[in-house]
Amino acid sequence: MPRPVNALIVDDEPHVRVLIRVLLKQLGIETVWEAPDGAAALDQANAHKPDVILLDINLPQVGGLEVLAKLKAAHPKIPVIIVSSQSTMKTVIQTRELGAEAYVLKHAPKSEVLQMLSDAFDNIAEGDAADAGGPVSETPAPPAA
């Protein structure tokens, strides 16, 4: 899969969703769905099957870690990028263990968030190429024995 063309933003803060939407537009993502909580995130993911999900950890009612686990169980091939203000190593490790592809700090300067998202999208595209048997690096495979 090339870089994502649509996305689902899951964050309970409307101004954060607007900011992420603007950054995604700068990266060429025009179709964006939004969810203010975990239940809505699951509904939106089921309805739209987005190319990528951007998920906050601090959500009302159902926490982001539980939402991440449910999203990955229901849609294991949809990449999830955590976009959170939490920056503890424990949280980062937990999200990676649950299947998140990347972790972006939302309170970093906008230019850094934009670069982190761009890098994450590139990594997702490269990972999909590897899953499809496409090239991941310039190193040739060793000859078959």
Identify the function of each model-found stretch.
Residues 14-33:
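Two-component/phosphorelay signaling modules centered on CheY-like receiver
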Residues 37-40, 63-66:
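Acidic catalytic/metal-coordinating carboxylates
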Residues 48-54, 59:
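Active-site beta3 strand of CheY-like receiver
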Residues 60, 88:
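The feature encodes the CheY-like receiver
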Residues 122-145:
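CheY-like receiver
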